[in-house]
Amino acid sequence: MTSGPFFFCIFIIGKYFTLGSAQDVSCPLGSFPCGNMSRCLPQLLHCNGVDDCGNRADEDHCGDNNGWSLQLDKYFANYYKLASTNSFEAETSECLVGSVPMHCLCRDLELDCDEANLRAVPSVSSNVTVMSLQRNFIRTLPPNGFRKYHELQKLCLQNNRIHSVSVSAFRGLRSLTKLYLSHNRITFLKPGVFEDLHRLEWLIIEDNHLSRISPLTFYGLNSLILLVLMNNALTRLPDKPLCQHMPRLHWLDFEGNRIHNLRNLTFISCNNLTVLVMRKNKINYLNEHAFTHLQKLDELDLGSNKIENLPPNIFKDLKELSQLNISYNPIQKIEVNQFDCLAKLKSLSLEGIEISNIQQRMFRPLINLSHIYFKKFQYCGYAPHVRSCKPNTDGISSLENLLASIIQRVFVWVVSAITCFGNIFVICMRPYIRSENKLHAMSIISLCCADCLMGVYLFVIGAFDLKFRGEYNKHAQPWMESVHCQFMGSLAILSTEVSVLLLTFLTLEKYICIVYPFRCLRPRKCRTITVLIFIWIIGFIVAFAPLGNKEFFKNYYGTNGVCFPLHSEDTGSTGAQIYSVVIFLGINLVAFIIIVFSYGSMFYSVHQSSVTVTEIQKQVKKEVVLAKRFFFIVFTDALCWIPIFILKFLSLLQVEIPDSITSWVVIFILPINSALNPIIYTLTTRPFKEMIHQLWHNYRQRRSVDRKETQKAYAPSFIWVEMWPLQEMSSGFMKPGAFTDPCDLSLVSQSSRLNSYS
């Protein structure tokens, strides 16, 4: 009997310590507990939409409900619902306000005259408590228009055409608690217009044309809690105590105006203010003492303004602040100790801000911070003690991996291997094709070298993705600022530009020899070598120039994890944006147009010149072959560059482009030419096919030599002319001497000569 209480006490004590140990789990910096489990998960696995804990603890409490804006939004939604016609649908009570105008509804002491085509305030019984006059044609509020409605508690005048409000329009409304004047045309409110509204708690005047206000505008509003002046035309706030006659004001909303600055006297009397919303204005100056007297402020929203400099002590008196939003401002620098006084801060929004001096010290004093929002997910590594950090990805990379998509992680190796192997194979095999046109072969080898660099670039990106696998957020920012990333980005641009210029050079060389066969514009060795060297020099200058002037180009190649500057707008440098446009919409677009025009002209020239000297049937067959080859050359160029041209045009037009596009372009679109050029310019040509046929025939000959020793050896010529179709050439053109100078051949052999440069 005595052992029962003893074991009961042991059970209770054990339970207590078990729960305590589970709830007080100590996790290393950057990790957080899984609820009441002893397991810890890193920051990147919390609030990512996946149940990594197994009990969904890592996905609990991920919503940012700091401040009381969410609760007020719900209340706001309820008010609109209550003020609408739906609130009068279930008429269970009789009307107690006497006769009402046509098209109006009545229930108890509530009157709904929404969309009743009214042009003036209706006259009903004085005991009405709620009057909704929304979406009518009321233009003015005359003196004493509501004087007899002493019991009126809620007045809704939204979506009328009110442009004039008499100073005594609201006289006598001593019981009014909520007044809605939104979506009208009010330009000015005279001082004392709200003088009798001593019980008013909510005043909503959003979406009007108010251009100025003064403290006297709100005289008499001793009970006002909420003041909303969103989307008006205010350009400045009075340099006087705005809350002088609103001592109980808690919520003040100036969103969507044109306010340029905040001075130190404006909020001096707003001692009870808990929420201040100043987003989407044109604020470019903040007085250091602008918020000194807002010691009860819980939420401050300064987002989407034009603030460039934050005074060092601007937030020092906001001891109670739990939510701060300074996102989407062109802030040049954030001081390391900028947030030191905000110990109670729970939510911090820094979206759209490039923080060049970011470091962990900046956020370490924010011990209660649970939500933080950055421009780049790479910044999350500098706030490891914050459970919810957004964004989780930039579309290219994620908190875990340099390449966010498994498809990209696989195909970066596949495309890299195809590009490198194809071009190296051509470089090695090209000397064995004994073509008389060595200058053309030299250009093709140079093209393969440039294309091979693209494969090297993709290989390195894949290697670093493998190196950072599972913990990329720890290395993201250092990686994008590293020499490796800068060099790889330069290598990609070098490959791209040299390849484009070489393709243009090869195309123009063909064009001149086909369209102008009797001109003295034949390619010479010295000229060809000079052009090739010049192209590579231009490529090096274009690719490495951004590394030589960091002030002008900023972090040109370090705007994303793949180090490719497709969206140069992210650098924040006008010079970088112009440079990127010159490359992609200047050099590359002009080159693409030249290639398309040249191949079209060549095909037309061959068609016009050959029809009179060859049989029609053979000519049609030959032109089909030429058309197919020209089509694939132009098609691959278009497939590679048209998407990039479109993206650059859209970015110039400030169209929002998903960040994930960059990685798909870099892995699947940009290398198209690099991967297919070896096939188009070498592997599908007649000389290469003949060489392979010869090697295969010789191999079979060696296999059968023991059985057929007396058989005459097959001895095909080693002089291969790069052309198509070979069998259609006359015997005279099969002699090596006939090809010593392709530009001197007759007009009849133009199509064959064209093939000799393929």
Swiss-Prot record:
CDD domains, per the entry: 7tmA_RXFP1_LGR7, LDLa
Keyword Protein biosynthesis: no
Highest taxon above the source species: Eukaryota
Pfam families xref list: 7tm_1, Ldl_recept_a, LRR_8
Family matches, as Gene3D superfamilies: Low-density Lipoprotein Receptor, Rhodopsin 7-helix transmembrane proteins, Ribonuclease Inhibitor
Residue ranges of LRR repeats: 127-148, 151-172, 175-196, 199-220, 223-244, 248-269, 272-293, 296-317, 320-341, 344-365
Disulphides: 27-40, 34-53, 47-62, 485-563
Glycosylation sites noted in the Swiss-Prot or TrEMBL record: 36, 127, 264, 272, 325, 368
GO molecular function: G protein-coupled receptor activity; hormone binding; metal ion binding
Residue numbers on the Cytoplasmic membrane side: 431-443, 508-527, 599-629, 673-758
Annotated InterPro entries: GPCR_Rhodpsn, GPCR_Rhodpsn_7TM, LDL_receptor-like_sf, LDLR_class-A_CS, LDrepeatLR_classA_rpt, Leu-rich_rpt, Leu-rich_rpt_typical-subtyp, LRR_dom_sf
TM ranges: 410-430, 444-464, 487-507, 528-548, 578-598, 630-650, 652-672
SUPFAM superfamilies, per database record: Family A G protein-coupled receptor-like (SSF81321), L domain-like (SSF52058), LDL receptor-like module (SSF57424)
Main localization of the protein described in the UniProt heading: membrane
GO biological process entries: adenylate cyclase-modulating G protein-coupled receptor signaling pathway; extracellular matrix organization; lung connective tissue development; myofibroblast differentiation; nipple morphogenesis; parturition
PROSITE patterns found in the cross-reference section: G_PROTEIN_RECEP_F1_2, LDLRA_1, LDLRA_2, LRR
Keywords assigned by UniProt, alphabetized: Calcium, Cell membrane, Disulfide bond, G-protein coupled receptor, Glycoprotein, Leucine-rich repeat, Membrane, Metal-binding, Receptor, Repeat, Transducer, Transmembrane, Transmembrane helix
Cellular component terms per the entry's GO annotation: plasma membrane
Binding of Ca(2+), residues: 45, 48, 50, 52, 58-59
Membrane topology note: Multi-pass membrane protein
Quaternary structure note: Interacts with C1QTNF8.
Function noted in UniProt: Receptor for relaxins. The activity of this receptor is mediated by G proteins leading to stimulation of adenylate cyclase and an increase of cAMP. Binding of the ligand may also activate a tyrosine kinase pathway that inhibits the activity of a phosphodiesterase that degrades cAMP.
UniProt family annotation: Belongs to the G-protein coupled receptor 1 family.
Protein name per UniProt: Relaxin receptor 1
